[in-house]
């Protein structure tokens, strides 16, 4: 009984004391204030250091770009650098209509030599319409451009490239178009003269020199020469005229051969002589090419004034190459003027 009374009393005490306890008053949940959205601000970049304001500059004047020029035109350019300036090709010399240009070449390719340099070069220009012939000698030491190679003496053109290179060299440097060529060496030259029974040469300038023996010639006289004598006469160099005197003598001998070949005896033997000469002379001129020129040859044989002879005396200047070679520089304009007369 007492135990029940104690429990009841405790329970009553708790109930009475609950209101007297200071528990916090329950508040309503707070109302959240609206969120304020701030406008975005630009993110500042790092400061840029100040720079100098450039001063105005002048606008450059445009330069003209030169149009590339083919220095060699239709000719082959040099195969290597040149120690000297290579001249431009000259204009082509326009000869008379139907004229025929033959380059006659004397080479020093004897058996004891290894070269085939041209010792003599004579251009024979035949004008059938006028019945005239011009002989033009080219000095072997002319310093010219060999198309496709370099600057060199003209006398090596045939040795390096045969007829084609020599013809191209004459066209490039002197404007001469070559139709045919005839090449003879020293031994064959003697045979040509001996086959004709020797030739009669009219000597313009007398001199004395030694070849296989001592020769003495007087001006204005005619001398009968066999092959060896004629060869020595052409090649002698010790007289006062120098190389240009050799050109004159070569022309004298060519005319003597021509006169003998075109004589009555020569004409009757023409087919025979042609067959013999093809064994001695290298040429691209056939018998059918020669026959149309026989009437002109007959006219010239009867009238020697129809033959004109030219050299380049006074139209060259001596010069020493960087390698020490002695050559002749051509006065191209003077030579062109001469050729325009000779080929017309």
What residues fall within each predicted segment?
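Bacterial N-terminal signal peptides that target proteins for export
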Residues: 2-8
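C-terminal motif of bacterial Sec signal peptides marking the signal peptidase cleavage site
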Residues: 18-20
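Non-catalytic, solvent-exposed segments at the cell envelope interface
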Residues: 22-344
